[in-house]
């Protein structure tokens, strides 16, 4: 499984697929479809972001009862201009999308093949979306898979300080706010008093949002203004502008409180607040503990339950599928940068983790309650 995943990761990374490029999405979908098991059903599902290319669903059936969902995404962050073909460097495979998350997609394909011949399997489906990196619509796929026994998501993996393999069973909720300010433009030299600065209003809004950050509090809220754009000329009071803020907390309710705290007018400028995207929180520590214990015993080494602040589509499925485990991809680094990489050795260790989880899931009824 690992050796095949190494070859397939390289083939996937060789295709540039930045989020929102429909032509590139069709190219990467074509590559993945060619790697699907011979007897698999291949479907296209409408993407949550309607202007993006349709998502890809690959399914295999068996005579048993267990239903397993495998999840990943095909879109990446790095633009075509910054893209380069994958390169090997010492023990790494370097290239845009290696860790986030084409290495994980390759392992997910291996997991689908491993499930194909299991007598306990009723259905295994691999869902690969085209808008995870930037989504403007409401996530569309949760209800379709609500009757599945388990969801395994193949975002990048990690190890503990002691070197043990870790998986992700807890994630923060995440949201992005867009604030649009409307002030009044005026000549900054001859009549600045006639203007209402959208820039100053947004700067004040940014300070307000940042002041609500409470990472040590009960919701572990982080509220971070990240992008401010305002002004068109050096001699004009800015009449408009936009501010983007990244919010993370244990629940969406904490994010909604921040959103509600922003006034509709600041320093004379009107403020419009829009939530551009949102992921629910995920906490599957209790539900996944028996499965992780059973898989660790089969593997002969610990699989550690971990948590992560970054958003993932696993969180959407954790609402409906109690056994949801994320972070099953290879270990790596520099995500969202051109020099992103994976540790090639981790393809082997993570393959072992995935296969142990599948064995425990299919053979041990107690592992899924």
Predicted regions and their residues:
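Metal-dependent amide/peptide-bond hydrolase catalytic core
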Residues: 1, 17, 157-164, 169-170, ...
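Acidic/His- and Gly-rich active-site-bordering loop/insert found
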Residues: 1-96, 117-120
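Short beta-strand segments
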Residues: 71-72, 127-129, 152-155, 180-182, ...
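Glycine/serine-rich anion-binding loops at beta->alpha junctions
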Residues: 75-79, 92-107, 187, 313
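Glycine/charged-rich beta-loop-alpha catalytic/anionic-binding loops adjacent to active sites
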Residues: 84-98, 182-185, 300, 335
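Phosphate-handling active-site elements
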Residues: 89-91, 111-126, 209-219, 361-367
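Acidic/histidine-rich catalytic neighborhood of metal-dependent amide-processing enzymes
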Residues: 101-170, 368-369
